[in-house]
């Protein structure tokens, strides 16, 4: 990115195009074919799975660390776009607002990846600074650190199908107090209603100069923050 310029990544979304992902693509097509209102040509049927949330978190963290000033997720609502016919929807959204009217009431349920995406973006408000992070020894784990006005977010994502243990260290930020900890993974979400994510732990102190050991569930996103909201 040229110095002094800003760039926004638009329409982040995953399609299974690599040979290594061929089995996922076969399953994606099978799921789309079994759903009456899904576009067979342009749907991401893994939006119902927690793994899609960690994939999208991974993409966002890489985008942030590369120097982009913002990003847009593809997409908000299934009801926004159809493909082969008016009733063949592009299944990519956080939900389907017309579920009860046309496509089944369960389609209005908030899907897992909403919680991963909204958690990260909630704690990267406009004007946030992004700090350089280095990850070593574990290719399935990515990290991002950002902050504004003395408040910080530390985000870790594990896209592996097995648990990982990592160590958080900083020679700049010696400690971080008053932290909340959020854990996004299957079976760990704490929610209020169908849209608000609650912390799994609160009032934590991270001793970053000494190092903090963190155990991450498979396919998980962990966020520490001392923002007071």
Language-model features: locations:
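Short helix-capping segments at alpha-helix termini
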Residues: 1-3, 174-175
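Trp/Gly-enriched beta-strand surface patches
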Residues: 175-209
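Structural recognition of the beta-strand scaffold that forms the well-ordered cores
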Residues: 6-11, 69-74, 153-156
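C-terminal beta-strand-rich structural cap/linker in extracellular carbohydrate-active enzymes
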Residues: 197-229
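Extended hydrophobic-aromatic, low-complexity segments
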Residues: 20, 82-85, 155, 163-167, ...
